[in-house]
Amino acid sequence: MLPRRPLAWPAWLLRGAPGAAGSWGRPVGPLARRGCCSAPGTPEVPLTRERYPVRRLPFSTVSKQDLAAFERIVPGGVVTDPEALQAPNVDWLRTLRGCSKVLLRPRTSEEVSHILRHCHERNLAVNPQGGNTGMVGGSVPVFDEIILSTARMNRVLSFHSVSGILVCQAGCVLEELSRYVEERDFIMPLDLGAKGSCHIGGNVATNAGGLRFLRYGSLHGTVLGLEVVLADGTVLDCLTSLRKDNTGYDLKQLFIGSEGTLGIITTVSILCPPKPRAVNVAFLGCPGFAEVLQTFSTCKGMLGEILSAFEFMDAVCMQLVGRHLHLASPVQESPFYVLIETSGSNAGHDAEKLGHFLEHALGSGLVTDGTMATDQRKVKMLWALRERITEALSRDGYVYKYDLSLPVERLYDIVTDLRARLGPHAKHVVGYGHLGDGNLHLNVTAEAFSPSLLAALEPHVYEWTAGQQGSVSAEHGVGFRKRDVLGYSKPPGALQLMQQLKALLDPKGILNPYKTLPSQA
């Protein structure tokens, strides 16, 4: 039942630790390992070129003269050691592997400019890489592209305490930026499960959505300016810190979501909202998906402006989080669970509104059980149940991941459809995501990669999504995995214009090749 007094956190919620911090703290699994370096005994990831039908384009190969030139541009920032290159060649899901022989670690936009000028002259392909936490293979090479890492471009350049405008380099880690602005009574407008590793430049390049999208919208609205280095080394300065600028084309929008195919983002200007004085989280069990939808409608009506997140997950998600991460549900077992967050300026006012909503939801049968938290520690505990689902899935076997945007009322139908379609051939079929913006994370696990299972999933998932007028990528981007399925979400004319923009800004095609755009539009 919903607590009517201050929450006394049950001891069994912390089972499986030693100690609460070990179980509920910052993830210690793959997300915490940048580049997802192989653990001892882990099977080697097959080369992408051997698993997928892709041919290398006629780029040059890196020579000793190229390495010498790079060493002059970034002294001490040229990595050629094969062991050190293993992790950045492999994607986070451990399903794609390139064979790059060199990684460059510039510190400044000027160094990036010199690198790209040299690569443009020599026709050398470049793979930009941030925290390497992407889900669609956009951040790792397909063949032997040079990896350009932004990891050393990690300085905050300015922060204005009145406007909340942050200017920083692209390699700043999202969690560290969050800590920086929170110390100044602001928050970042996005929050991701991968925040401990992902870079703000990668977030912008992929137009990452995340857990605060419902309240603060997309990066197309919160990013005020960008500095971008084009394929030929030209530095494009669109780094305004103005909230209003109606002079000509808004060029920065081209690069938000372009996944490093049009230019490399080196500096970001972003608007940070004020830090809420009161944050409350409720975790509820629902008897069915229809009740999840009704709870969301009721929630919007009763909570209004203080509603900042509405997440849902199915029972299988909770079972996997418990099995692989030893995190227990704080409510009784239910077919579905929802996590609701409110953020506001008046703790008493917000708690009262949330309490009235919870009483109504329970009394009307929308919710069968629930609990809520107001202090930061317990809030983080409840959020961990949602944020660490991806980690739990990665421990369940090979994962087929789909990031779909669908009409809210049809959001879960594809999950039940696939369970019937796949039967025992899939280990688990789960659905969770951001109900507030119609984003479903559909995941299918199996003991190992299976071509027959993949054939049963694709193109069926994309055809089903197109039939609902949905999108095959809600927030993860396109990368390598989805480049040839854009036609399910974009008309031929739009694809042709994208190809024309790519040819204009990167005529040699050296920036992140084999990604984002179809091989043939």
UniProtKB/Swiss-Prot annotation:
Effect of altering residue 419 to H? In D2HGA1; uncertain significance; moderate reduction in catalytic activity
GO cellular component, alphabetical, reads: mitochondrial matrix; mitochondrion
Q: Which family does it belong to?
A: Belongs to the FAD-binding oxidoreductase/transferase type 4 family.
Q: Kindly list the organism's lineage.
A: Eukaryota, Metazoa, Chordata, Craniata, Vertebrata
Q: What is the effect of changing residue 439 to D?
A: In D2HGA1; uncertain significance; mild phenotype; moderate reduction in catalytic activity
Q: Which residues carry this modification: N6-succinyllysine?
A: 101
Can you name this protein?
D-2-hydroxyglutarate dehydrogenase, mitochondrial
Q: What is the effect of changing residue 401 to A?
A: Loss of catalytic activity
| Chain sites annotated for binding (R)-malate | 386, 390, 401, 476
